[in-house]
Every structure is written in structure tokens, then in C-alpha cells.
Amino acid sequence: MAARADNVSRVDHDGVTLVEGATHDVRFAFTERTGGVSEDAYSSLNLGSHVGDDPFAVQENRRRTLEAIGAAECEHNLLVPNQVHGDHVVTVTSNGADDLENIREQIAEGCDAIVCTVREVPVMLCFADCVPVVLVAPGGFAVVHSGWKGTIARISAKACQALCEAAGCQPDDISAYIGPHILGDEYEVSQELMDRFASEFACIDAATSRMLDLSAAIREALMDAGVEASGIVDTKLSTVRQNDRFYSYRNEGGTCWRH
């Protein structure tokens, strides 16, 4: 059975504010905008290296984030994938230097979820409206980037399956955490896309609305994969309404950093 999945709180670490939790000896966090060194209107804790920010600022922001979560000594093992809005999942089962270098080559080619079953390997994915999903089980964890393409492809369920295989656990052992994202009443999409989602997910009603609730679809996919409803926590934090705390690609006109 999954551990209680409601242990998430907002904590300030010398200016770096995290929405964080810990389950099965895995510590995880969703970052906010504050506490970094990036400059301009989108300051300051930008973690994305692909948005035109100073690379040294990004490196320092990532270092501060790891320090805040208690993983500063593991910075040399940090994994940050090239996110491509797909459904490819990469699994990490060794923290050896050569093995991690091989993983870095794989994730540089593109992946949107990383499963990890070894200690001292921090995993960092970047977001600005898309849905962050953290899966935690005895013996491992997964971090998932789920935009609409990944959501309709059920990437969270695929990461769940990969985590179960790698950690030797069952889906009902998993606790799932859905982080800050663009909420269903903020995300208007085309009728064609609504119809596609409605054909895939029972929770999506394309007949009455064009507002797409990605987190509801993710929850359905996880439950279909065997994760218990009681083991799924949605922080219900909005990147749009709470744009002062989180980056929002849509709310900021397509120009923003990444948390």
C-alpha cells in the first residue's frame, strides 16, 4: 500500500522557496521563482538552460536548489534531460560515473521522464505550465514532464510501469504528487484536441467545454495503471493565477524562464 501522500508543505530555505515533501526516504520539491541569481523581468530562480539565460546563472540556480533540498553533495550526479514533449522514459539503476555518463547521452537525445532506483542521483526537470509529476515508491522514484502530448500518451502511467519494474514494487505502493501547472479552468484548447482527449479519458467532456484539465487526465491514467486514488496528491497550485510564484509560458506570452 502507498504511504500517506499528503506530506507536502511550502518551506523557505534562505530565499529559495520549495513546495516539498518526503516519502519512502525520497525527498522531492517543486521550486518557485525566488532565491536565484537570474536577472530581468523573469527573475530569479530559472532552472532552464534552453531559454536564453546566462549559463552561469542557471548553474548557480541549480546549485542553490540542490542545497535547499539537501543534495548539494550530489551536484556532480545531477541529471537534467532534454525535454521534447514526448513519452520516452529513461531508467537509472547505477550511480557509477560511466553509467551516468551513458544516461546523460541518452537523455540529451530527448526524454520526458526519468526513473531512478539509486541514491545520490538528483533528477531535475523544468516546467512553465506543463504538469510536473513525481512518483515515489519503496526503492525508487520517477520525475515526469507531462504536457498535453505526454498526457494523452499516458507518460505518467508509463513511468509508473517502469518504476515498478525497476524497483520491484506494485502500482499500489506508489505515491504520486502533481505539482504546479496550468489548471483546467485556465487552459482553453481547440475542439479537435478536446475530442482527442475525450476519446482517451472518461473524465474529459468535450461536449460542454474546451477547457482541458490535464491533471484529471493524469490522475485517471495513474489509477488505470493501478495507483490508488488515496495515493495521488494534486497540489492544485496554478502557474497562471500564481504567476508571481511560478513561471507560466501562456500567461507570460511565451517568454519566460523555467521552475
Labelled PLM ranges:
Residues 1-259:
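Active-site microenvironment for binding and transforming phosphate-containing groups
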